[in-house]
């Protein structure tokens, strides 16, 4: 434990095997995928060798970076877009291999790493089986899904076997951004906004909101969803979302009129948010005030936003010592059963 009186547990920390990163770079260079957002993003990221080295290292170099910034434990998750840009068979094989690799790192460094399991939503039943293997046999602490899968979102009931598995296993699903899908991405790419600057939040906020309105959380009331970047703007919009969801129902295409709870109730009862990339006291304290102190977890967003000074900035958020311990340590321990 660091000298501040709590462990700093970072909950959205990316990794990937180098061979997967090489595949992304090749796909972007050859434009072998019909996804302008992916091509734009991995053309840029693929030109950053130090970033790739940090992503691929789940050993001594990463731990040295953690030590230099005061991070006690990282929860590792397969970087975006994970396996979700491949065909179902390839995706399932890559997910299983990645889970085996990251589980080995956790076994080697149990005091420094925990990890989430990658699954392939392309095959929901297979994803549910892999979730059970990864949690029960490998000891992984939840699932990572990098938002849309070839333009499809988890509000579609065909994916709900994944929700059923996560609820039965009592593990959360972390919905992490990727770039907007082809049917959405055009203006974002044209304006250079497809990545973390704006497109990530817009796409992932849409995805999570669609899940809230789908009825999935009535069918799976104990399902827990984790969302980064202080909630992808959804906490800021909760009042208006509730108002419009109520007053505009006759004009809204979906089953929203059959929901058992308001959208804000689903957010406060089923969703947790992390501070990844948002080391700014006004935002952190706002989200805590909206969702509650028990529902906000610290994250760094390593290695994409490896800024050790931001750890100190988050230490200095004007909340009580007890609430800082929740933010950095005990909320993560509870949500991920650490």
Give the positions of each predicted feature.
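Divalent metal-dependent hydrolysis catalytic cores, especially in the metallo-beta-lactamase
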Residues: 43-50, 63-86, 112-120, 141-145
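Charged helix-capping and loop-helix junction motifs
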Residues: 91-99, 155-162
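Catalytic pocket-lining loop regions of alpha/beta-barrel enzymes
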Residues: 106, 133-291, 295
